């Protein structure tokens, strides 16, 4: 399904950003984020052009009721991407994986609270066990796992907002990404036109930045399609694909899975 493809792509994404860093040297997180936004927007616009849906995209920006949900969704998506990129660049992929393991359970809770989806006593017990896992993770990660908590909360709320939207899924996601573009372009123009940004762009860097837009935009499109056609709780279950692959990526990238971290993961599994 579209949702499964989405989480497979997300699961292996850390390796792409790791590759970018290894081939191009340490890239400023903010500059990488700005390039990611711009090229993801280009990717989405191309998809909408092929599908003949560009008029629907422009209509979103004229609908105040839709914008009331799209703007918060865009802000949450921006925050999620920013935290994720920073974590990957700073060797905290396992913390990201822990956050993505917790997300489904936050989604379960939101599904029950907002959309009145039935949550059994088993789900309640599972959520309680996960809370214990989060508390234990403060030891394994050397303090409160802020990356874990931030990613879990932001994307879960984002999923709930997406579930409440009635407009075309791909159009919705494209609108959210497009809203970020002015901020990204202003940042590049004012702060990264020198050698630490655009001035230092080689052909390889440019190709990797374009690729970053594709690996960002495509999963979001698949997610937007899947979340509209699946119960929120089923979406939550599919989310376990990505963090499981994230642990594999963390191992490839040299992160140590200590005993304390393993105990935290076992509680959440």
Predicted region positions:
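C-terminal transmembrane-helix exit sites in multi-pass transporters
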Residues: 86, 103-122, 244-263
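Hydrophobic alpha-helical transmembrane segments of multi-pass membrane transport proteins
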Residues: 4-12, 16, 71-88, 150-161, ...
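Membrane-interface helix termini and inter-helical loops of multi-pass transporters
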Residues: 15-29, 56-59, 89-92, 134-135, ...
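Hydrophobic transmembrane alpha-helices of multi-pass small-molecule transport proteins
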Residues: 44, 122-138, 151, 260-269
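Hydrophobic/aromatic residues within transmembrane alpha-helices
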Residues: 20, 32, 36, 87-88, ...
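Glycine-/small-residue-enriched transmembrane alpha-helix faces in small-molecule transporters
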Residues: 1-31, 132-164, 214
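Membrane-interface interhelical linkers
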Residues: 1-5, 41-72, 121, 173, ...
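Helix-helix packing/entry segments at the starts of transmembrane helices
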Residues: 35, 97-102, 169-179, 217-251
